A protein has these predicted regions:
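Transmembrane beta-strands of outer-membrane beta-barrel pores
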Residues: 142-146, 178-182, 220-226, 281-285, ...
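Membrane-embedded beta-strand positions of outer-membrane beta-barrel proteins
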Residues: 136-140, 174-176, 204, 218, ...
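Structural signature of Gram-negative outer-membrane beta-barrels, strongest in the C-terminal barrel
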Residues: 207-211, 317, 323, 331-333, ...
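N-terminal plug
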Residues: 3-18, 22-55, 68-73, 87-95, ...
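Outer-membrane beta-barrel channels and translocator barrels
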Residues: 33, 165-168, 179, 209-213, ...
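Outer-membrane beta-barrel translocator/receptor signature
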Residues: 75-77, 89, 98-107, 112-187, ...
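Outer-membrane beta-barrel domain signature, strongest for Gram-negative TonB-dependent receptors
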Residues: 191, 195-327, 333-336
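Solvent-exposed loop segments that connect transmembrane elements
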Residues: 185-193, 228-248, 291-302, 340-364, ...
Length: 466
């Protein structure tokens, strides 16, 4: 049976009035899923690819709703939730996965059954929990090169061990994953393999059950990767049906991501319900370099620095009162992001510009982002076959930004707060360096619908939401 998360409970996917594709751990193992991109081919109306010019940055779309940008301040249209924690940026999302309990892909607007609202849909990633019995698992795989004249082997090692630390009170789990990929392509400009990547993930989890009605589940993970930049093919040079690539800047991606979550579940007699609290923290430090023009010439090369620090908390209650299933909750999210972009373009120096100064493009931005949300939904059974769906959400968002235009200027860093946002550009007379701004938004969004069970195996449903 494939299940999906509805409210705080787990239900058969056939009974949930949401367009959802769910994968349990056995299915994920059978499909050999090691990243989200792998699921694009098993899910209708869903694309989980990355942005071609920025490795690891999500370009997710569901039912045609998505974005195609590496700018981290653009909010995700498709929300990614890891162990119930919303990931606030697209950067550092398309990365390796292991030891998964389930993945659920929800199509359409979300926001009444869990914290953050999204317009295109949501991807719910649930990593493996500690077990009350001793278990271990290890796997080693080697993928050989497809062709003798390009690429190298792709080797993956992973292991998990789980079991009770204090019987009936405390369970623990530890997992480690390492991938060494020699690359899939050959760079014809240098005769080297292209696409090399090293990735290491270490994850620990503890589950504490002080009483029969109270459970704490904490997880901590560190993700590090070092790889070449994106593998771009310029079709003005090579046929699109070939694997030929020639670039003079193989680029790089350096990622260091720390993630933690703490989930608390308290069973209460009120409505035979559950109070759930989910706290999440994520910190990202990333640097990149990419050959955007995808040629052996220096026409457009780009580098970036990116940092993110986010904190979130979601508190919700889910219970049943006679014919009504009720979910209510509140959500708080805050993040600080900083992004520096550097561009190497073959632009002509102005006449008289000193040869001792670098003519390079620098700029970027910093953003403080805060979100509050209150949400609720009631599923009321009019009959044994017909259920009404009624929901309401209030959301408030605030953004505070400092921007430095990406223009020729002395070397600076938004991450290190050395790029000016006021005054004028010393390289271009009269041009402002940037600006600062602040704005906020609030909205009440309703949801109404009907669900009808024709048979035990067939349902019809329709919903309206703003």
């Amino acid at each position: 049976t494939v299940t999906a998360t509805k409210k705080a409970n787990v239900e058969n996917v056939q009974d949930v009035p949401v367009a959802v594709t769910a994968f349990n751990s056995e299915t994920l193992d059978a499909l050999k899923v090691n990243d989200l991109q792998s699921l694009s081919y098993s899910t209708p109306n869903v694309s989980l690819e990355d942005v071609g010019t920025s490795k690891g940055t999500a370009n997710f779309s569901i039912r045609g709703l998505g974005i195609n940008s590496s700018i981290p301040s653009i909010d995700p249209t498709v929300g990614v939730f890891v162990d119930g924690v919303y990931i606030g940026v697209n950067s550092g999302v398309v990365l390796d996965l292991f030891d998964l309990d389930s993945v659920e892909i929800l199509r359409g607007p979300q926001g009444l059954l869990f914290g953050r609202n999204t317009t295109g849909g949501a991807v719910l990633i649930n990593t493996g929990n500690p077990t009350d019995e001793f278990r271990y698992k290890a796997r080693a795989t080697v993928e050989t090169p497809i062709d003798d004249d390009r690429g190298g082997p792709n080797t993956t090692l992973q292991a998990t061990v789980s079991g009770p630390l204090i019987e009936d009170k405390l369970n623990g789990k530890l997992g480690i994953y390492h991938n060494f990929d020699d690359g899939y392509f050959k760079n014809l400009a240098t005769d080297d393999n292209l696409g090399e990547a090293h990735t290491t993930i270490v994850r620990g989890a503890l589950e504490w059950m002080p009483t029969d009605t109270l459970t704490f589940l904490g997880k901590v993970e560190n993700f590090q990767t070092s790889s070449d930049g994106p593998n771009g093919q310029n079709r003005g040079f090579y046929d699109r049906g070939s694997f030929d690539i020639a670039i003079n800047n193989p680029g790089f991606l350096e990622n260091d991501i720390t993630f933690g979550s703490l989930r608390t579940d308290l069973d209460v007699g009120f409505g035979n319900g559950t109070i759930t609290n989910v706290i999440g923290y994520r910190e990202v430090d990333s640097t990149t370099s990419a050959d955007i023009d995808a040629t052996p010439l220096t026409l457009f090369h780009s580098g970036s620095e990116f940092t993110q620090e986010q904190f979130s908390e979601e508190l919700r209650y889910s219970g049943t009162f006679d014919r009504a299933d009720v979910t209510v909750g509140g959500f708080y999210f805050t993040q600080e992001i900083a992004y520096t972009e550097r561009r190497d373009l073959p632009t002509t120096r102005p006449v008289g510009f000193p040869a001792s100064l670098d003519w390079e493009f620098n700029g970027g931005g910093r953003q403080d982002h805060t979100v509050y949300g209150i949400f609720g939904q009631v599923d009321y059974d009019f009959t044994e076959k017909l259920t009404g769906i009624f929901g309401l959400r209030y959301g408030y968002e605030e953004k505070d930004v400092d921007i430095t235009y990406v223009r020729p200027r002395p070397n600076c860093s938004m991450v290190n707060e050395t790029c000016p946002t006021t005054g004028t550009n010393p390289y271009i007379a009269g041009e402002p360096n940037g600006f600062s701004d602040k704005d906020d938004w609030s909205e009440v969004t309703p949801k109404i619908g009907l669900q009808y069970f024709h048979t035990d195996d067939t349902q019809f449903y329709g919903t309206y939401t703003k």
